[in-house]
Amino acid sequence: GGHPGGARRDPRPRRTRALRSQGAWYLPAPVRFHVLTIFPEAFDSFLGASLLGKAIKGGRVRVERVQIRDFSTSRHRTTDDAPYGGGAGMVLKPEPFFEAVESLGPPAGPVVLLSARGRRFAHADAVRWSLARELTLLCGHYKDVDQRVADHLATEELSIGDFVLSGGEPAAIVVLDAVVRLLPGVLGDHESASGDSFYEGL
């Protein structure tokens, strides 16, 4: 018994039907990255360069930069305030973060706060996140982010090292690069990523 019109249905799942010429499987739907920041322009050159730029142009990855100031309710779109519970310095208010994440719809992946006090980012995190359909990165600035963002919004809190940055944007670039290069088809073949030193246990 044939199929109408002589067409046969491919029995493989739709997500894995297509092969790249290099032999690596790819997922037709792009992996979505949301980056919440008060400095979206900090990512301009990085998003257009190297592997990430190619992955975006090839439809493999979609990166959306969300301007946190757009969700500020203050007259001058301010996003900083004194720390909740007291303390020195200024921190980013929690409300714009909550509103911005809510505007993205129901989360389909981890919501990661990039913070100096977070757990150290490791290759295992990049591998785990490369399997997600979506990843949301929250970039702090000033002294820090209001603690309520870490307690009630982020699913994870990570740092890229024991040093101080002026904001979470450089850390977000590190995470994006580490995750995107692991996506099937981005490097051209699986051996390119599986031959990395961390895969080899070094």
Annotate the PLM regions:
Residues 199-202:
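Long, charged alpha-helical interface segments
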Residues 68-71, 141-145:
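Short glycine-enriched loops at secondary-structure junctions
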Residues 34-36, 64-66, 110-112, 135-137, ...:
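Hydrophobic/aromatic beta-strand patches that form the interior of the parallel beta-sheet core
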Residues 50-54, 127-131, 152-153:
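Short, solvent-exposed amphipathic alpha-helical segments in soluble enzyme
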Residues 92-141:
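S-adenosyl-L-methionine/SAH cofactor-binding core of RNA-modifying enzymes
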Residues 145, 149-196:
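Structured adenosyl-cofactor binding patch, chiefly the S-adenosyl-L-methionine
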Residues 25-104:
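N-terminal nucleotide/polyanion-binding subdomain common to many enzyme families
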Residues 1-24:
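Compositionally biased, low-complexity flexible segments
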